[in-house]
Structures are given as C-alpha cells and as structure tokens.
C-alpha cells in the first residue's frame, strides 16, 4: 500500500506546568486533523483511563447516608463527598479494604487512613471531616480499580452486601481536566496547517505525558481493525526495515523491576521490552523463581506505559538487535 503522503507532526513539545499538569504541542498536521485527533484523544482520556476510587464505606453507628455522627461536625453526606476526593493508588492489587479510626478534636485527613505497604494516598492532607472535643470517627473503606464513572446502583454487589455499608458512585478516572486547542501552523510556504495543543491535568496517579501515550495506544488499537479489512498482507514497496516503537527496543532494566524479577526475565532470554510483552502470563509463571507477586509487578509497570502481556509483534526481533 502506498504512503498517504499526508504530513505527520515533526515537532512535539511537552511543557510541564506542574507534576500533574502539562501542555503537549504537536505540529504540523494537515488541515482538519488537529480537531479530528484532538477530540478523539480527549474523549479517550476522559472515559478510558484506569484509576482507583472508594466504592463502599462502613461508618460505626451509621445505617444510611442521611445520618449524623456524634462529635463530627459534618453529616454523613458531606463525609462521603470528602472521601471521594481522596486519591488512592493501588500497587499489585485491584481491590483493598482500609480502616480509619480517629479520636479527639481536630481534622480527620486522608493521611489518617491505615495503609498496607502496597497502597498509596497521593493527597494525604485532604480533609475528610472535623471532630469536636470527645468526637470519634471510625470507618472501613473499600477501594477498587476501574475506569470511567460507575454509579453505585448499577454495580453488581451480589447478595452478600453487609447491612450498614454505604455504596458510593465511583469516579475512577485519574484525569481531572483535559482540553485541546487547534492553531495555525506553517511549513515553508504552506500556511493552511494545524497545530494541536493538548492541556491535561491529572490527580497524580498517572503522569500527564503517560496518560496521553496511553490514550494514543488505545486509539491505535481500536483503529487497527480497519487497517486489516482486506485480509491480505500489503506488498512491500521496497526492502525498507519495519518501523519499531522505540519503547520496545529499550532493555527490561529500564522498567526498574526488582532485581529478582529482572534476573528471572534474563534467565529466559528476555532482554528487551519487546521480548517481554510477547510472553503470556502462563508462560511467565512457568519461569523458575518468578511468582505471582513478580508477575503483578511486571503487569503494572507495563500498564503504566500502555503495554500488556500477550501482545503480538510482527518482524520481531528487528535486524541488528543484539542480545546481551
């Protein structure tokens, strides 16, 4: 198949505004492509990013959300709203049950929640409630992994729902805000081109640049089916080497895995990220000394880069790739 001949962006500028906000500028695009791609990326970022949110809460002495708690200034509705503002990040797990017990006058903050070693709170200073003298607040919080927005009344909670548990609407998305703008760009004598500017802010669970990379990969995966409509492999124009994503050419050491996990992979001749993503979970679990904990670690670091296990790569390994 012949090349489309359309311009591809050659200038990509990432402007970090803060650790959770960035502006990404890409140019040049053919006229109209700025809006086409900008809108697609924005919708994917808002709807398809994986995040974590509290989904169920139990508060001592509370049977329904319209109650009050003695010694707590806020009512239960306000407590639940404040709890939704806590930003959780789970490592190596999809669900966790946490406890919070606080007594005495003062503010109850997110940092007062008891955490296991593989759970992190991004905003520990976030205020959940205020206690009066002699007040006490004790609660259990269920945090789950998900994507998008899921109302509490549509989740399948089964028949084992405990009386007194309050079900929350869950907003899993780690994207607080994303907007795009299209400006004019120029290449030599052409002035009818687009410049795409994506302004993104996250809650800290994922970096802005990684979020855009992930959204781009989702878009590519969804569109790939249209490229295969003919069902036959296109005839190569010439013996040009296949283009390989530079990320796949990076050694697995760049994933910053534990020494144990890294050594297990190298023992199986897995030296590059491209080698790793083609292995399935079952294949990795058969690796000596690599258990479920190491597998979860590998899956998490790959997911942060928009990659998964069991992916299929054509023309791998590329010519000239050296094995360490």
Swiss-Prot record:
Keywords, sorted A to Z: DNA-directed RNA polymerase, Nucleotidyltransferase, Transcription, Transferase
Alpha C-terminal domain (alpha-CTD), as annotated region: 244-324
Keyword presence, Transferase: yes
Matching InterPro entries: DNA-dir_RNA_pol_insert, DNA-dir_RNA_pol_RpoA/D/Rpb3, DNA-dir_RpoA, RBP11-like, RNAP_asu_C, RNApol_insert_sf
Pfam families given in the database record: RNA_pol_A_bac, RNA_pol_A_CTD, RNA_pol_L
Chain segments carrying region Alpha N-terminal domain (alpha-NTD): 1-230
A GO MF label: DNA binding
Catalyses which reaction(s): RNA(n) + a ribonucleoside 5'-triphosphate = RNA(n+1) + diphosphate
Signal peptide bounds: none
EC number: 2.7.7.6
Matches recorded under Gene3D superfamilies: 5' to 3' exonuclease, C-terminal subdomain, DNA-directed RNA polymerase, insert domain, RNA polymerase, RBP11-like subunit
Record remark on domains: The N-terminal domain is essential for RNAP assembly and basal transcription, whereas the C-terminal domain is involved in interaction with transcriptional regulators and with upstream promoter elements.
Alphabetical list of NCBIfam families matching this protein: PRK05182.1-2 (NF003513), PRK05182.2-5 (NF003519), rpoA (TIGR02027)
Subunit structure: Homodimer. The RNAP catalytic core consists of 2 alpha, 1 beta, 1 beta' and 1 omega subunit. When a sigma factor is associated with the core the holoenzyme is formed, which can initiate transcription.
Main function: DNA-dependent RNA polymerase catalyzes the transcription of DNA into RNA using the four ribonucleoside triphosphates as substrates.
Protein name per UniProt: DNA-directed RNA polymerase subunit alpha
Gene behind this protein: rpoA
């Amino acid at each position: 198949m012949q090349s489309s001949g359309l311009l591809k962006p050659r200038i990509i500028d990432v402007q970090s505004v803060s650790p959770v906000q960035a502006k990404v500028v890409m140019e040049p695009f053919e006229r109209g492509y700025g809006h086409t791609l900008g809108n697609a990326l924005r919708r994917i970022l808002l709807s398809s990013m994986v995040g974590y949110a509290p989904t169920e809460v139990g508060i001592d002495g509370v049977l329904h959300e319209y109650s009050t708690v003695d010694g707590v200034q806020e009512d239960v509705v306000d407590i639940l709203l404040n709890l939704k503002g806590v930003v959780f990040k789970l490592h190596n797990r999809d669900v966790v049950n946490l406890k919070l017990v606080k007594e005495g006058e003062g503010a109850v903050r997110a940092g007062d929640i008891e955490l296991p070693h593989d759970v992190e709170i991004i905003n520990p200073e976030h205020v959940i409630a205020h206690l009066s003298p002699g007040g006490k607040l004790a609660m259990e919080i269920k945090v789950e992994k998900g994507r998008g927005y899921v109302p509490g009344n549509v989740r399948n909670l089964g028949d084992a729902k405990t009386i007194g548990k309050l079900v929350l609407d869950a907003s899993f998305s780690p994207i607080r805000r994303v907007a795009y703008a299209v400006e004019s760009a120029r290449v030599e004598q052409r002035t009818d081109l687009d410049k795409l500017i994506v302004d993104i802010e996250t809650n800290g669970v994922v970096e802005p640049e990684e979020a855009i990379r992930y959204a781009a990969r989702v878009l590519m995966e969804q569109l790939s089916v249209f490229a295969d409509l003919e069902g036959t492999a296109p005839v190569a124009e010439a013996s040009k080497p296949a283009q390989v994503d530079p990320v796949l050419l990076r050694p697995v050491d760049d994933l910053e895995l534990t020494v144990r996990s890294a050594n297990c992979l190298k023992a199986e001749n897995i030296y590059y990220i491209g080698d790793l993503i083609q292995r399935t979970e079952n294949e990795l679990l058969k690796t000596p000394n690599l258990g479920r904990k190491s597998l979860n670690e590998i899956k998490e670091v790959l997911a942060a880069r928009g990659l998964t296990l069991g992916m299929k790569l054509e023309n791998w390994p590329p010519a000239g790739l050296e094995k360490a």
